[in-house]
């Protein structure tokens, strides 16, 4: 009887030691951006309201901006899938920064829902890049655009960056749609 009890304890102890000796295979987190091919109408409506309100605010201000960040000589469909994701993540980084620090209180109230949505998108994009292309190096086209963005962030006023990001928000969402379509984006 004592021998049987010791055997059970011994088997239990050895079993737990053996299980701990081998690394556990954790299931890979999947990268699914397909939900962003067609964002929820509620999210799009909130973004549309924010953009319209910003346009109304712009009419009342005297901003003179020449920022042409979102004017590119190439189309996003020309980029590889990791480049597309990197591009949209960078566009969202600027947009989220702008929406986090709006220049008017009126805009601050309207941008909360779009900000939450875009922040979630950015997290999903970063997860995908970390999972699928952790050591990805951007192509020459994208590298040039990223450098242009970095320079603009340093040289442009907050108001001009805000105008550029918000007025081109639907271009960012179209770029997101292309990134979500992966190889099917043409």
UniProtKB/Swiss-Prot annotation:
Q: Where in the cell is it found?
A: Secreted
Spell out the disulfide connections. Answer: 31-128, 65-160, 178-185
The reply to whether Transmembrane figures as a keyword in the UniProt entry is no
Which superkingdom, per the lineage?
Answer: Eukaryota
Keyword list (alphabetical) reads: Antiviral defense, Cytokine, Disulfide bond, Secreted, Signal
Q: Which organism is it from?
A: Gallus gallus
Quote the Gene3D superfamilies the UniProt record gives. Answer: Interferon lambda
What are the BP-aspect GO terms? antiviral innate immune response; cell surface receptor signaling pathway via JAK-STAT; defense response to virus; innate immune response; negative regulation of viral genome replication; nitric oxide production involved in inflammatory response; positive regulation of immune response
Q: Pfam families under this entry?
A: IL28A
- Function description: Cytokine which plays a critical role in the antiviral host defense, predominantly in the epithelial tissues. Acts as a ligand for the heterodimeric class II cytokine receptor composed of IL10RB and IFNLR1, and receptor engagement leads to the activation of the JAK/STAT signaling pathway resulting in the expression of IFN-stimulated genes (ISG), which mediate the antiviral state.
Q: Does the keyword Secreted apply?
A: yes
Q: Which N-terminal stretch is annotated as signal sequence? A: 1-21
Q: Which family does it belong to?
A: Belongs to the lambda interferon family.
Supply one GO CC term from the record: extracellular space
Q: What is this protein called?
A: Interferon lambda-3
Coiled coil, from the record: none
Which GO molecular-function terms appear in the entry? cytokine activity; signaling receptor binding
């Amino acid at each position: 009887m004592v021998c049987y009890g010791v055997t059970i304890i011994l088997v239990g102890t050895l079993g737990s030691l053996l299980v701990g000796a081998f690394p556990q295979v954790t299931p890979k987190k999947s990268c699914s951006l397909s939900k962003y091919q067609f964002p929820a109408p509620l999210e799009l409506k909130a973004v549309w309201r924010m953009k319209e309100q910003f346009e109304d605010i712009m009419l009342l201000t005297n901003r003179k901006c020449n920022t042409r960040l979102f004017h590119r000589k190439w189309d996003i469909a020309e980029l590889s899938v990791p480049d597309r994701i990197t591009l949209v993540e960078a566009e969202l980084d600027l947009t989220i920064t702008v929406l986090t620090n709006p220049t008017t209180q009126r805009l601050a109230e309207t941008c909360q829902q779009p900000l939450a949505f875009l922040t979630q998108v950015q997290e999903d994009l970063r997860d995908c890049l970390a999972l699928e292309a952790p050591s990805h190096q951007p192509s020459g086209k994208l590298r040039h655009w990223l450098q242009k963005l970095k320079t603009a962030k340093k040289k442009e006023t907050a108001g001009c960056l805000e105008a550029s990001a918000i007025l081109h928000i639907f271009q960012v969402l179209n770029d997101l749609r292309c990134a979500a379509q992966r190889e099917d984006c043409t």
